[in-house]
From Swiss-Prot:
SUPFAM superfamilies: Sm-like ribonucleoproteins
GO molecular function: RNA binding
Family under the similarity heading: Belongs to the snRNP Sm proteins family.
Protein name from the UniProt record: Probable small nuclear ribonucleoprotein G
Pfam families: LSM
Keyword Ribonucleoprotein applies: yes
Subcellular location(s) per record: Cytoplasm, Cytosol; Nucleus
């Protein structure tokens, strides 16, 4: 790890996985990760905005700016692969 240098996000293990994304403004969306860039902007497909446990809205394909993401949580199980350096 190098201090002072920002590393690119490594979200490749989350590609094609269903995620819960918490956004600023107290918004939450669930969707399947289709892509990302170095600024952690993400593309989600089959996206659903979760307003409450009983209120959900299907919004389809979306692009979310990285600076509005507070938390990303996988909703599917993932295989653990140790990082090699």
């Amino acid at each position: 790890m190098t201090f002072g240098k920002q590393a690119d996000p490594d979200l490749t293990k989350l590609l094609d996985k269903k995620l819960a994304i918490k956004l600023n403004g107290n918004r939450t969306v669930h969707g399947i990760l289709r892509g990302f860039d170095t600024f952690m902007n993400i593309a989600l497909k089959d996206t659903v905005e979760v307003v409450s446990p009983t209120e959900k809205y299907e919004i389809g394909m979306v692009i979310i700016r990285g600076n509005s993401i507070l938390l990303m949580e996988p909703l599917e199980s993932m295989a653990y692969v140790p990082k090699t350096e």
